[in-house]
């Protein structure tokens, strides 16, 4: 006698932590009814290294090399937030030239991060060609980083009160050449991808986040702006010299995976616009506070000693962090990267709390993937742009 199954058995599948579309060591426990997703539970912590506790046992200068391991594809932003924290707490002013250099480096890093989001995202949904295209342009950005900082990744370039070294001779012209080269390439990506019918089938209407949901889930960055909210910390907080340049907040109102793709394409164009303007008006002068002091003291200053300037260049000073608390944030490629820290009249911070955008943005996928197909998980997760280094810390 043949028994007919009256109820469907649900299947639990573990995606990751070694699945190529996880972009790191993320594990998803997915409950399936055939191809339909019933539930999804992210499992985090595989890349936890105790970054917050390490910060509480290091001076800011000692801690700087560690922070580039959070979001290792946009390291300039982790460095920026780490030096901004004590600068804001102790009201340390930075020279104008240093602020412009920082701004240029941040926008180059934003482009590099968005490029390395675009390639794997397209590979996740079946398009291999863009991956090789983006590597071509990304290498040029890394060449610029290497010329200015000595490192292609993990730059360790920002310092309290400025940057480590000034831009080398010819770097500005080289960067301008890249800007004029890269802008048409973004248009090339759009021609190749945006109206492709297979691409549109995979992303249009997939992973929709409404305006209200984006606010309720505390999303930030492209995840927030793709849902119709014009919120960019570069405009809101007025940090560095962004207010002196002409640029627009990129946003979309549909809230789906296609909107998040279009927004990041627009942000790359806007970043090129910011870099061009900054390169044309970048002022001269010192690139860090120590250099300001050296110039102010005159010829008799100890900062003019050969040993101080060349043999063992004096690092940024280690100073006591006053007994108060502060929250600082920057607009990173993934969203709002923030640090809440508490000083205790000590050279070490008493508390160093990291607010990573990826961790917050990763809370919404379980809701987005319900009642979707299994293949849509890769599309939704890819459109969020997560890096597990900053999620797990």
From Swiss-Prot:
Q: Which InterPro entries match?
A: NADH_Q_OxRdtase_suD, NADH_UbQ_OxRdtase_49kDa_CS, NDH1_su_D/H, NiFe-Hase_large
Task: Provide this UniProt record's keywords sorted from A to Z.
Answer: Chloroplast, Membrane, NAD, NADP, Plastid, Plastoquinone, Quinone, Thylakoid, Translocase, Transport
Under Enzyme Commission nomenclature, its number is 7.1.1.-
Would the keyword ATP-binding be found if you checked this record's keyword annotation? no
**One biological-process term from Gene Ontology?**
photosynthesis, light reaction
**Cleavable signal peptide:** none
Subcellular location per the Swiss-Prot or TrEMBL entry: Plastid, Chloroplast thylakoid membrane
Pfam families per the UniProt record, alphabetical: Complex1_49kDa
Top-rank taxon, per record: Eukaryota
Q: Which GO terms describe its molecular function?
A: NAD binding; oxidoreductase activity, acting on NAD(P)H, quinone or similar compound as acceptor; quinone binding
Q: How does the entry describe its membrane topology?
A: Peripheral membrane protein
An annotated GO cellular component: chloroplast thylakoid membrane
- At the top of the EC hierarchy, this enzyme's class is translocase
State the reactions this protein catalyses: a plastoquinone + NADH + (n+1) H(+)(in) = a plastoquinol + NAD(+) + n H(+)(out); a plastoquinone + NADPH + (n+1) H(+)(in) = a plastoquinol + NADP(+) + n H(+)(out)
Function, as annotated, reads: NDH shuttles electrons from NAD(P)H:plastoquinone, via FMN and iron-sulfur (Fe-S) centers, to quinones in the photosynthetic chain and possibly in a chloroplast respiratory chain. The immediate electron acceptor for the enzyme in this species is believed to be plastoquinone. Couples the redox reaction to proton translocation, and thus conserves the redox energy in a proton gradient.
Q: Which NCBIfam families match?
A: PRK06075.1, PRK07415.1
What does the record note on quaternary structure? NDH is composed of at least 16 different subunits, 5 of which are encoded in the nucleus.
Question: Which HAMAP family does the record match to this protein?
Answer: NDH1_NuoD (MF_01358)
Regarding protein family, the annotation reads: Belongs to the complex I 49 kDa subunit family.
Q: What is this protein called?
A: NAD(P)H-quinone oxidoreductase subunit H, chloroplastic
Which species is listed as the source?
Cryptomeria japonica
